[in-house]
Amino acid sequence: MSVWRPSDNKVYLPPPPVSKVVSTDEYVQRTNYFYHASSSRLLVVGHPYYSITKRPNKTSIPKVSGLQYRVFRVRLPDPNKFTLPETNLYNPETQRMVWACVGLEVGRGQPLGVGISGHPLLNKLDDTENAPTYGGGPGTDNRENVSMDYKQTQLCLVGCKPAIGEHWGKGTACTPQSNGDCPPLELKNSFIQDGDMVDVGFGALDFGALQSSKAEVPLDIVNSITKYPDYLKMSAEAYGDSMFFFLRREQMFVRHLFNRAGAIGEPVPDELYTKAANNASGRHNLGSSIYYPTPSGSMVTSDAQLFNKPYWLQQAQGHNNGICWGNQLFLTVVDTTRSTNMTLCATATSGDTYTAANFKEYLRHAEEYDVQFIFQLCKITLTVEVMSYIHNMNPNILEEWNVGVAPPPSGTLEDSYRYVQSEAIRCQAKVTTPEKKDPYSDFWFWEVNLSEKFSTDLDQFPLGRKFLLQAGLRARPKLSVGKRKASTAKSVSSAKRKKTHK
């Protein structure tokens, strides 16, 4: 007798449907109007290793290093309140205008140079590359004065939201830890802010929380967090607002090889080495196995520069193809090829002979920037589908456009007094309209306001002329040159010649 049995194989159901994210090209209509906007010369000067505080709770000289991120928050004018070249360009009842970034150039001033850093008390035990003798156990204090140059990095990243960085921080342990236990690590994400330190070759790490000796790395990062852009997270972002595109160049090699002094928290297992024959050789007690290199970025050259060149955005890496939501852009820049630290000297005590104590030495670092953009005017038709999509993406966009969603009708009867200040009724609560808070007010960016820097005369600016050239366009002639009329005698003689020829 045959009996039916269900199949033992697993049955996989289709995945549930997800809301589809579409490109901005699907609902943004581009016009033929382009604008040029540029900043003024942007300068910053400070101490390359640490900030100087001469008054309580007030920084007199900021920390300005060539190893810091420069994050420009570029403010754009509202195109819906902009003077447009045509009155019938769009319908304000059913459409809204937005900006699209189609080109940019980051100008860098100052000469190429290599900046160095160091620590007067760096945890350096032995030279493990060419050790003349076998190093013994560490003494009480083996710190030395060591300086080095850093990894070379050039970066230019553009988006309408701040770039996202990643670093390793101190995590939460599952069980209570004792003094001296290795802290757990946790990968953390945060916005990259202006002044954050880049990865210099020692890893993206929270050094202040994970290196308590304050002698493991140079001075400029000993209490800092070095961040690395989280390209994986930004590339996988649904709407692609954090990163339209990026330019990156990194290089590094190892210059010196050292090891650290201190008790080894995790000793080398016995099965990994053969013990020395006797104590006289000095190898019975193993030397420190905590090795580390000093990084170097090698030579800087103008042949490998990413800056002072125009770049054109044809297709972004994400779904946002250069649309500047919120009328703003975030430009993240790193350039360690111009990280020269300038030494200044001031006379403290005059004398006929040189005495080192008669002079005070100072360090300064200066940076110079100039940013230029080409923007394209675009319009969006506010259909029900588009408004619903934008509301799910970012409801603040519709609020800025004064497009609101009607609340559902209230099912209760509310009380409304006429004389709200009268003492005959109960005290009425003060109704205050909440102020709209800037979502990035708690973060630090370099503000660049381009609200009054827009121009349609592209041929009057260097980047505008480059844009016209690559686009195959020509500027409209400003001066009309009249043609010279032919003389009457010439016309008559020409007619006679034609008649004679016949």
Swiss-Prot record:
The keyword Disulfide bond applies. GO terms for molecular function: structural molecule activity. One of its GO terms (biological process) is virion attachment to host cell. Keywords: Capsid protein, Disulfide bond, Host nucleus, Host-virus interaction, Late protein, T=7 icosahedral capsid protein, Viral attachment to host cell, Viral penetration into host cytoplasm, Virion, Virus endocytosis by host, Virus entry into host cell. Residues 478-502 are annotated as: Disordered. Residues 478-487 have a biased composition (Basic residues). It holds the Pfam family Late_protein_L1. The keyword tRNA processing does not apply. It comes from the Viruses. It is found in: Virion; Host nucleus. SUPFAM superfamilies: Group I dsDNA viruses. GO terms for cellular component: host cell nucleus; T=7 icosahedral viral capsid. Belongs to the papillomaviridae L1 protein family. Self-assembles into homopentamers. The capsid has an icosahedral symmetry and consists of 72 capsomers, with each capsomer being a pentamer of L1. Interacts with the minor capsid protein L2; this interaction is necessary for viral genome encapsidation. Interacts with protein E2; this interaction enhances E2-dependent replication and transcription activation. Forms an icosahedral capsid with a T=7 symmetry and a 50 nm diameter. The capsid is composed of 72 pentamers linked to each other by disulfide bonds and associated with L2 proteins. Binds to heparan sulfate proteoglycans on cell surface of basal layer keratinocytes to provide initial virion attachment. This binding mediates a conformational change in the virus capsid that facilitates efficient infection. The virion enters the host cell via endocytosis. During virus trafficking, L1 protein dissociates from the viral DNA and the genomic DNA is released to the host nucleus. This is Major capsid protein L1. It comes from Human papillomavirus 42. The lineage of its organism: Viruses, Monodnaviria, Shotokuvirae, Cossaviricota, Papovaviricetes.
